[in-house]
Amino acid sequence: MAKAIIDIETTGLNPMEHRIVAIGVKLGDRDIILMDESEYYLLVNFWDTVEKEGIEKIIGFNIDFDWQFLKLRSLYHRLKIKHFRKYQGRVDLRQILNGSGGQYRKGTKLVDYCRFLGIDVPEDDANGSEIPELWEKFEEEGDEEAKRKICEHLKRDLERTWELYKILVDCGLIEE
């Protein structure tokens, strides 16, 4: 069974009002970063990648947020999600670490857990709240540096989530 770390970047927090601008997929040592000015084609490429790579287990930090966006934005574009039910068993690292249904509490962001566990988080690292502004710069001004920053942020989050996942497996909080 192929497993993948999934992370998305969006223009906001509400999938009924905001869009996905980038999707990251980590398969072992391989990172796949998908970005397209058309959200429709971005999602088509994502679901094609999931099928082509045989991904059956989706893992992420606060993956329920990502999944809700992927599901509703695909629905908005009338895209078929093949094998929808098998992804309902996704692994949400935030829920495992937070307990209590994974509800947000101060100090429970990915970077907080990474710093706590010694996973590298540079002080000058971009954070998700900067993505809408970066996307706007790219979309309206063609700012390639803004696009690069979104991709780099996504790659770093994929790597951190993978490192966190490995620690949780090693410590027995997740069984493979």
From Swiss-Prot:
GO MF entries: nucleic acid binding
Transmembrane segments: none
Gene3D superfamilies: Ribonuclease H-like superfamily/Ribonuclease H
InterPro entries: RNaseH-like_sf, RNaseH_sf, YprB_RNase_H-like_dom
Domain of life: Archaea
PANTHER family attached to this UniProt entry: EXONUCLEASE-LIKE PROTEIN, YPRB RIBONUCLEASE H-LIKE DOMAIN-CONTAINING PROTEIN
Name assigned to this protein: Uncharacterized protein MJ0365
Gene source species: Methanocaldococcus jannaschii (strain ATCC 43067 / DSM 2661 / JAL-1 / JCM 10045 / NBRC 100440)
Lineage of the species this protein comes from: Archaea, Methanobacteriati, Methanobacteriota, Methanomada group, Methanococci
